[in-house]
């Protein structure tokens, strides 16, 4: 979690339902994805991201197809689950920024791990998550904020029956981070820039701490967490006021 200097929550974690596929249990991955598309409303971005993750994953890994399934997605899949061996609905933690645009330029956001990042990270440390810090505080303090997944090793026979448990390691949650920013001052600075282009930085002259850092216009970082759609990204990218910068 990320907090301001007074303990106000700036970046939260919450559980979402995700569709994952087992490479070991699915012979025709493309056909499975095609049949799942109308059931859980897969977009082109969902499919392209999944294909990239499949190529970079190991044979024994489960690969996330879609994050943040709706209740309707889950209900439709539940009715036909027997037709999709190797496909499961799981719960994963994802990031949420409760104040939206207010801290976007300083906190940044997390997003799905891309092909370049997959080559540089320790895959074991990121098992069970698809998210990594992209910009701002989230990227600068990724190593501190990111926890470590747990695991259980077992020995099984050819039919999947467990013969014995070989070992278990509990997961470790990431560290909390307290910033020098002050939510109240950040809000006042944002109000002063409402409807205008510009930036405000407030610094405590005694300590050098940054108390507020606002750039206007801003953007909603929550759009990037589960994968921003093409239309939303184009609107931000092509905006003459350049909210992403």
Where are these regions (language model features)?
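Periplasmic/cell-envelope proteins involved in peptidoglycan metabolism and beta-lactam response
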Residues: 1-245
């Amino acid at each position: 979690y990320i907090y301001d200097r007074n303990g106000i929550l700036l970046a939260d974690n919450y559980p979402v339902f995700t569709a994952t596929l087992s490479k070991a249990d699915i012979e025709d991955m493309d056909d499975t994805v095609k049949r799942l598309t109308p059931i859980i409303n897969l977009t082109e971005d969902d499919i392209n991201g999944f294909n990239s993750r499949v190529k970079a994953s190991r044979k024994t890994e489960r690969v996330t197809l879609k994050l943040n399934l709706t209740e309707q997605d889950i209900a439709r899949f539940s009715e036909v689950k027997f037709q999709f061996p190797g496909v499961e609905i799981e719960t994963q933690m994802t990031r949420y920024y409760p104040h939206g645009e207010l801290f976007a330029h300083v906190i940044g956001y997390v997003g799905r791990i891309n092909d370049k990042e997959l080559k540089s990270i320790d895959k074991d440390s990121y098992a069970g998550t698809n998210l990594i810090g992209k910009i701002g505080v989230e990227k600068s303090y990724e190593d501190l904020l990111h926890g470590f997944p747990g695991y259980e090793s077992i020995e099984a026979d050819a039919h999947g029956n467990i013969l014995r448990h070989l070992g278990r390691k509990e997961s470790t949650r990431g560290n909390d981070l307290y910033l020098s920013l002050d939510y109240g001052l950040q809000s006042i600075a944002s109000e002063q820039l409402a409807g205008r282009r510009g930036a405000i930085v407030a610094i405590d002259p005694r300590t050098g701490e940054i108390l507020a850092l606002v750039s206007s216009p801003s953007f909603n970082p929550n759009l990037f967490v589960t994968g921003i759609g093409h239309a939303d990204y184009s609107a931000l990218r092509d905006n003459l006021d350049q909210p992403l910068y």
